[in-house]
UniProtKB/Swiss-Prot annotation:
S-S pairs: none
Species in which this protein is naturally found: Cellvibrio japonicus (strain Ueda107)
Location in the cell: Cytoplasm; Cell inner membrane
Pfam family, one: DUF489
Protein name (database record): High frequency lysogenization protein HflD homolog
Keywords: Cell inner membrane, Cell membrane, Cytoplasm, Membrane
Any Gene Ontology CC annotation: plasma membrane
Major place of residence: cytoplasm
Presence of the UniProt keyword Membrane in the record: yes
Length: 207
């Protein structure tokens, strides 16, 4: 069966965009609103018609993630180390989550509630983000393995930013689930880098 490398690449970009935003807000206290909105809304739509629809129907919404992937796929790249570390941690957590149907059920139900809340307040409203951050704490944070986020203490101690980080990690896990669903696996990151890199360049070129 042939792989849909574009779908695999889009889902990977979703992961790395969300984890880069985690690193960014942890270090600076700020988030680019459009990229943040894309990541959060990708989490809220659980029944999209196709992969691109998860990210608002436009690959340009994933420009940040695709540009990071372009750099990560270069030989001996040393940039975005924290983004990569968080991304690999997300893949590990998603694999753990896949074996917990009970937890998946809770997450699905709570995301439905958050989606309804977003219709009233907007997807990136503090109330919605607090709901999603709380969901991460009550579910994903109960696994033995946890992603340790590095950043400035003055930002990490703020409840609002802590909620944003947890909501973004949940969004990254959602993209990791999508990545698995469309045929993604970790071996591709080692042996099929050229196919993925070609898709990254093609998607960026068409923006």
């Amino acid at each position: 069966m042939s792989k849909n490398w574009q779908d695999i690449t889009l889902a990977l970009a979703g992961i790395f965009q969300a984890t880069h935003l985690v690193d960014q807000v942890a270090r600076t206290g700020h988030l680019p609103p459009d990229a943040f909105k894309c990541s959060i809304e990708s989490l809220l739509d659980l029944n999209p018609p196709d992969t691109l629809a998860v990210y608002g129907g436009d690959a340009a919404n994933l420009r940040t993630g695709l540009e990071i992937m372009r750099e990560l796929l270069r030989p001996s790249s040393s940039k975005y180390r924290e983004t990569l570390r968080y991304g690999l941690g997300v893949l590990h957590l998603q694999k753990k989550l896949a074996g917990r149907r009970d937890m998946l059920g809770v997450i699905g139900s709570r995301i439905d509630q958050a989606a309804q809340q977003a219709e009233t307040f907007g997807s990136t409203h503090d109330n919605v983000i607090a709901n999603l951050g709380g969901l991460y704490s009550e579910t994903i944070s109960t696994f033995r393995y946890r992603i340790q986020v590095n950043g400035e203490y003055q930002y990490l101690q703020q409840t609002r930013i802590a909620n944003q980080i947890r909501a973004l990690l949940l969004a990254a896990i959602r993209s990791a689930m999508l990545w698995r669903q469309v045929g993604g696996n970790r071996w591709q990151l080692l042996f099929y880098r050229k196919q993925i890199s070609w898709q990254v360049e093609d998607l960026l070129r068409r923006m």
